[in-house]
Curated annotation (Swiss-Prot):
This is UDP-N-acetylmuramate--L-alanine ligase. ATP binds at residues 120-126. It is found in: Cytoplasm. GO terms for biological process: cell division; cell wall organization; peptidoglycan biosynthetic process; regulation of cell shape. Pathway: Cell wall biogenesis; peptidoglycan biosynthesis.
Amino acid sequence: MTLLANRRLKSNFGIVHIIGIGGIGMSGIAEIMYNLGYKIRGSDLTSNVNTERLRLLGIEVLHGHNANNINGAGIVVISSAIKHNNPEYQAAILAKIPIISRAEMLAELMRSKVAIAISGSHGKTTTTALIACIFEACGLHPTVITGGIMNNRATNAYLGDGDYFIAEADESDATFIKIPATIAVITNIDVEHLDFYKNFDNLISAFRKFIINLPYDGFAVACIDDITVQNLIAKITSRKIITYGIDSKNAHIQAFNINTDNGYSTYDVRIKAYNFHNEVIITQVTLPALGKHNILNSLAAIAIAVELNLDLNIIKDGFKNFKGIARRFTKIGEYNNITVIDDYAHHPAEIIATIDTARCIADKQQGRVIAVFQPHRYSRLKQLFSEFTHCFQRVDQLYISQIYDAGEQETYNLSHISLVNAIKSYYHSVYVMPINNLDDLPQIIYRQVKPCDIILLMGAGDITKFAAILPQQLQKLLKQHVYSDITTKN
């Protein structure tokens, strides 16, 4: 019996208390459960857009962590980020209140629906949102939880009354294998989270289990442009796997005739899936996003729709309501024909994809790409130092801020200066400089930027708050400069 199957359990639970409710994953769980009728309360150390959204819904959000916060709770939900010395966690143990992980709660919520789980090193959030777009277009009204804010809904989760539950599945600590998926998506597999997995083989094994756990009537969708994914699925014969790609001619779903213009990608899709006797072409699919990586993300959504025999005409136009994900190549603003972009990219593969997209735009308008990168976690920089050194070669100027530690202690003898020096030694043509204080960013950028340039701010830390105000700051500096010139002339 699941939490959803027995509606009477809602009143028996008492309060579901969520520790760290402001996190992107936890806030989604909270919103879905609240809309299902559960009594939800949570706590977090800081307020953010997620906690404010939950408060507006009517959810009690407590500031800080305190043992008294769990009073009246019937269940406590925690994420992997919550340490065992957390006072609320300790109080729940003493009170013998059941403590379950976010992944376990997500699994329970998904169990009464047809569960579609999207995992992979990169592109999970966008892929999840694109699948939701097609399902909405087909009138299927799914329930959705993503790892980012969907711009068309201003939330990362919403409840639908249909049969499908579409959710991003976090692979960082192997909890994604707990999700009772009927359909599993793997976007790619990259060297990441080795602090948990210890080695790359263990990470690959977790993805294998993710597929093997599917029921006999389920199927996986996998990107075979990714060589690691390609090698993985070649060894799995006990589950149905639909493949997609751009470069791979053998993919069941393949995009070709790709064109980009004015923020849109258009392409044709060749279908060689199991349920088609002959090859089928969908022409002129339009995606309101740029970049090869986003086209690949859309192909995963198309693959699921095709396998479920959804209307091909609806599939073709299924992305028209896609408004993007917050911090995924988000245009913050413009000033003096200069564009400021904010992006969550914090892994070398993500950085390369983001820079490639910016480079395409800049080249068309004869501008430059000026990148500002905030490294995220000492452990990630140490683990992927060589990859970080080589991923910025297509920018014209690069500024690297101090490392956002995300709670880690500096035990790696690394700094942002280490990365700056390494990049300088490899790419003499790239202008690269450290930024010791992001408050100085507007003045630094203002002195360098020219019309038609793209200013690209990347990182998973607090660089986003600097990106949010940069256009206004640059505009203010421009006005001051113009006023100063006029005053001097007079």
